[in-house]
Amino acid sequence: IPSRPVGGPCYLGKLTMLAPKHTDILKVLVNSSRTGIRRKRSTSHLDDTCSDEVQLWGPTARIFASILAPGVAAAQALREIERLACWSVKQANLTTSLLGDLLDDVTSIRHAVLQNRAAIDFLLLAHGHGCEDVAGMCCFNLSDQSESIQKKFQLMKEHVNKIGVDSDLIGSWLRGLFGGIGEWAVHLLKGLLLGLVVILLLVVCLPCLLQMLCGNRRKMINNSISYHTEYKKLQKACGQPESRIV
């Protein structure tokens, strides 16, 4: 609440409810995605130790899990997606390694072919013959696609690196929300969020716990009172014959 609600630098002239349309929200999101700076996320690449054993559920298991335990079905789907990503990364790494070895072999074969052709030309000239004396020796075409292969090879490596694991989801969300903040600010905000979550849990759960404790205490008191009352009744019932005999 400002110190000067009427007049002054903190004057509240008119209060209105903010109720933007769905199209307005989409326009703002599109403009922010176009003009905003892309922040670096805390992702780590999948290593060779990840599990790539994909075991998909059958139709019966999927139906029963979706009806009886949707959370288990969602967790299973996420786990299989992670394993599929690991399998894709390993396959891409093997493919790039294989193509790299094949490229090295092709390069060495090219050098060997050029050396053999130079040796043949030298021997023909040494014996006084030209290329026209042997059919097909005057025209020699050896295509060179090494530059294109290297570019595509590099693109494959870059695509493999696009698959990663977000190791700090909250930190990435805070960096995207507040812009270019430092790591110390991210850790501070994470600590504040954790403290806020703990306080909210205490606020939500503490009344329930207190109510349960009060209910148990009230029940114990009522039980003790009822036991005491029954004891008095039994004592009175046992004391009446004795008084008659006296």
Swiss-Prot record:
Residues 114-130 are annotated as: Immunosuppression. PANTHER family: ERVV2 PROTEIN (PTHR10424:SF81), VIRAL ENVELOPE PROTEIN (PTHR10424). The record marks 41-42 as: Cleavage. Residues 58-78 are annotated as: Fusion peptide. Glycans are attached at residues 31, 93, 141. Keywords: Cleavage on pair of basic residues, Coiled coil, Disulfide bond, Fusion of virus membrane with host cell membrane, Fusion of virus membrane with host membrane, Glycoprotein, Host cell membrane, Host membrane, Host-virus interaction, Lipoprotein, Membrane, Palmitate, Transmembrane, Transmembrane helix, Viral attachment to host cell, Viral envelope protein, Viral penetration into host cytoplasm, Virion, Virus entry into host cell. SUPFAM superfamilies: Virus ectodomain. The keyword Cell inner membrane does not apply. This is Envelope glycoprotein gp95. Disulfide bonds join 50-86, 131-138. Belongs to the Alpharetroviruses envelope glycoprotein family. Residues 75-125, 143-173 form a coiled coil. GO terms for biological process: fusion of virus membrane with host plasma membrane; symbiont entry into host cell; virion attachment to host cell. Residues 214-246 are cytoplasmic. It holds the Pfam family Avian_gp85. The chain crosses the membrane at residues 193-213. Residues 1-192 are extracellular.
